[in-house]
């Protein structure tokens, strides 16, 4: 700095991750001149920020700080495409979905790769932090060629170290570091933290991975390893069934319905996620299906509850606001590396599931949420500022869409905090077996800030060894829900590269329009992928109006 004072930036505009502030970036050009003649130059983009972590927590779990402020990690695991058949289009789509979901950190799982320069560029722009692991997992303890491995570490760090999104280095997934790695990293980049493997130094082992009763997330019994809604969990997840179009692309019709267990288990890692067993049993709690179309639609309902229950339980226990101290969750995992019946937020073919949109709702920066176990309503704030005199409203509707309960509470939201159990919903004794909950959060001026919607049954939760409970069973009567009348209008806009379809839906009936799915189809009636929906798999209350925008590249319409 003394020799080159132009490198000093006074009062810099800082780079922040999702919800915490803007993603300010600077452009830098460096030139080398000899005798006044430029002989080489390089351009780069960078951001100014500080990310550190420590274990000064009640349970010694790792907690991260960005620009001096504590950061609750709501992240996920990124799995590369199985055959490494990536492209800028695929990278853009998956990172755009990631940003839409609301997560703030992507863990580059140790069984994967270091992604492209374009990947890191987009993470910088989108505010997505990156936890980079180095290509070893539990079944690959050490590289065959240490020198080659160290050379790859060095070249990778040099390539990605200028990106503000790069937050943390980890030597391996559930394995051990190669001797000399910490020293090399410190030499190349002393600005970022490092740990030798993914389950140490304040990050405990993961789970659950498979389908469980959604009630278990609230009860903290979802993992056979004991409490896992606590501390920093690097792998905690649940599956979602793909849409029926994806299932048809994946297997023959004869294997789709009735479900051919052998084929489905093959496409589920030998039945690892229990898609042909427990997932199917939970879907059947919505009533036995007569076709794969009906089954797949009900499967989206379960996938939505899977995701919502996980994220909202971690919201409730954010940092030191809940029943247990929680510093971070990395969902296992959110993108699919290959076609599989245990999908996630989107399928390998880039077709989103209900999980994406219900995760996005759960991770909105100001969020009201319901606890199926406690029957309470809490409000979460992910901004670094407080909000006073907000009002949360809880409404309950029966199967005939009649409002049978309403209560509100005024809440003062602490900066980056939670108001837990702001009110308790008292369900009428004679309420219908299946009913609905609508939550509305209003600001101090009475303007709607966010909303949330749930379906619930009267079934009693009988423990973790059962598939019972108000989030898990007793939903057969959903088939009795009267059909709503929804009017639809749309307009098409375009820019140089994309089409935008603005769809306005209005529920003109007195019935709840339940779990509506929009699809953008080509002339062959096939979904156009990737397309970006601002929302999907949503419900509309009587009289409610909603606008959804669908965006797709113009080149995607060339095939009709």
Feature-to-residue mapping (PLM):
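Active-site-adjacent substrate/metal-binding segments within catalytic domains
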Residues: 13, 37-168, 268-304
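Substrate-binding clefts and catalytic carboxylate motifs of secreted carbohydrate-active enzymes
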Residues: 221-395, 404
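Alpha-helical structural signal in soluble globular domains
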Residues: 31-33, 118, 122-126, 159, ...
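Secreted/periplasmic carbohydrate-active enzymes, especially glycoside hydrolases
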Residues: 1-106, 114, 316, 320-326, ...
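Active-site region of glycoside hydrolase catalytic domains
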Residues: 40, 154-264
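Active-site-proximal loop/turn and secondary-structure-junction residues that shape catalytic pockets
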Residues: 112-114, 136-138, 174-175, 200, ...
């Amino acid at each position: 700095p003394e020799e080159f004072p132009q490198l000093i930036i006074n009062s810099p505009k800082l780079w922040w991750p999702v919800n915490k502030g803007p993603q300010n970036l600077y452009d830098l050009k460096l030139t080398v001149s000899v005798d006044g003649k430029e002989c080489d130059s390089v351009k780069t983009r960078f951001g100014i920020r500080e990310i550190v972590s420590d274990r000064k927590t009640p349970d010694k779990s790792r907690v991260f700080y960005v620009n001096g402020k504590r950061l609750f990690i709501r992240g996920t695991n990124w799995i590369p495409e199985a055959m490494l058949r990536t492209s800028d289009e695929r990278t853009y789509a998956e990172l755009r979905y990631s940003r839409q979901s609301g997560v703030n950190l992507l863990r580059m799982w140790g069984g994967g790769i270091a992604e492209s320069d374009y990947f890191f560029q987009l993470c910088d722009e989108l505010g997505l932090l990156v936890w980079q692991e180095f290509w070893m997992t539990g079944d690959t303890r050490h590289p065959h060629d240490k020198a080659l491995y160290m050379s790859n570490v060095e070249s990778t760090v040099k390539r990605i170290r200028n990106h503000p999104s790069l937050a943390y280095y980890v030597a391996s997934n559930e394995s051990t570091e190669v001797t000399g790695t910490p020293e090399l990293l410190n030499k190349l980049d002393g600005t970022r933290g490092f740990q030798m493997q993914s389950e140490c130094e304040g990050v405990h082992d993961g789970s659950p991975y498979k389908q469980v009763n959604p009630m278990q997330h609230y009860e903290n019994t979802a993992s056979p390893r004991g409490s896992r809604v606590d501390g920093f969990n690097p792998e905690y997840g649940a599956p979602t069934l793909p849409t029926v179009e994806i299932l048809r692309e994946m297997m023959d019709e004869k294997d789709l319905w009735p479900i051919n267990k052998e084929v489905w288990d093959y496409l589920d890692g030998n039945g690892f996620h229990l898609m042909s067993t427990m997932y199917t049993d939970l879907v059947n709690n919505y009533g036995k299906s007569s076709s794969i179309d009906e089954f797949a639609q009900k499967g989206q309902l379960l996938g939505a509850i899977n995701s919502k229950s996980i994220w909202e339980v971690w919201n409730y226990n954010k940092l030191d606001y809940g029943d247990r101290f929680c510093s971070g969750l990395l969902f296992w995992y959110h993108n699919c590396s290959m076609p599989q019946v245990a999908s996630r937020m989107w399928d390998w073919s880039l077709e989103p599931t209900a999980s994406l949109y219900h995760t996005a709702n759960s991770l909105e920066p100001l969020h009201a949420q319901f606890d199926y176990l406690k029957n309470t309503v809490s409000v979460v704030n992910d901004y670094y500022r407080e909000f006073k005199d907000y009002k949360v409203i809880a409404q309950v509707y029966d199967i005939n869409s009649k409002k049978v309960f309403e209560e509100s509470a005024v809440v003062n939201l602490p900066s980056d905090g939670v108001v837990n159990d702001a009110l308790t919903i008292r369900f009428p004794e004679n309420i219908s077996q299946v009913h609905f909950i609508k939550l509305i959060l209003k600001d101090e001026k009475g303007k709607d800030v966010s909303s949330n919607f749930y379906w619930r049954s009267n079934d009693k939760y009988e423990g973790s060894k059962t598939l019972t409970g108000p989030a898990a069973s007793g939903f057969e009567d959903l088939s009795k829900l009267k059909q709503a009348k929804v009017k639809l209008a749309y307009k098409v806009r375009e820019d140089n590269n994309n089409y935008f379809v603005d769809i306005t839906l209005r529920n003109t009936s007195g019935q709840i329009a339940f779990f509506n799915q929009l699809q953008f189809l080509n002339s062959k009636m096939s979904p156009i992928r990737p397309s970006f929906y601002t929302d999907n798999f949503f419900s509309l209350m009587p009289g409610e109006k909603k606008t959804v925008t669908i965006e797709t590249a113009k080149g995607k319409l060339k095939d009709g």
